[in-house]
Every structure is written in C-alpha cells, then in structure tokens.
Amino acid sequence: MPAIAAGLAITFKHFKNLLLGRTKVTMQYPEQKWDSNLPDYYRGAPALVRDEDGRVRCVACQLCEFICPPRAIKIIPGEIPSTDRFAKVEKYPEAFDIDMIRCIFCGMCEEVCPEQAIFLRKDYAITGFTRAEMVHHKEKLLEIGGVMHGVVLKWNTKK
C-alpha cells in the first residue's frame, strides 16, 4: 500500500506542475519546429559541396570512408581525363554513397576531410519510404550541399 500511495503522490505532483505550467510538454511537430532553436553544435546529416567553379570539392581520398565508424560511406574513385581543365586533381568520386540509416551523425567525416568537401547540415527530418531511398547518392548529396565559397574555419578560435 505505501508504494501505491507514493506512486499516486508523484502522479499528482506532475499533474499539478502541468496545470501550473512548470513543466515542458512535447513539441507538436508539424506545427512547431526546432529550426530556430537548434544549437550551433547540432550535427545533422552529411552533404557534399561544390567549389566556386562548380567542381566537386571531393578528391576521392577516401579518408571519410575509412574513418566512418558504422561504414556508412562508400566511395568509388575515378581518374579525371587529361583533357579536362581540372586535370591537375588526380581523382574524383565516380560514386559517393552515404547510407543515412547506418550514419550516426558523429561528424568524423567532416573533421577528417582535407578538402572541406563534406559538411553536416542542420536538418533533422530525413525520411524515406524504403531503404533504397535512404541511401543518398552523389547527385543528391551535391544538390543538398550546394556551393561553398572559400575556406571554412572549423575550429573555435575563441578558445
């Protein structure tokens, strides 16, 4: 009996706090969104970016593929033809796939990238009806990432 009374006391305390507005309530998702409340350190899904010339920044070094803990990234490197104006870069990704179901959004791929070609975006609604839709290919990753101008300072200079 004492356990039941203690449980009811806790329930009444929570109910009282709810009526007085002292507790947080679940956010009603479609109407309310976290977009304005996301912290600066939020890590979303990865995306590829292009440089100012429209070239894919990724040089297919495969560091992100090797460092990815769940092995969510798959890259097939290819040679750039010598007739191309960007032939000085020796490789480019023929295929670049990220399995968003396996990705744990740790940010290690972003940190290890020497070309600043992969960034974690700030969206949290990543959906799909099938497993195949959750594997983002190079074209989709580039569409999401867009163009990145200049060099981005990834480190906090205030510390």
Predicted regions mapped to residue ranges:
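Non-ligating segments of multi-cofactor redox enzymes
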Residues: 1-102, 111, 115-159
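Conserved strand-turn element in the central/C-terminal portion of the radical SAM core barrel
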Residues: 106
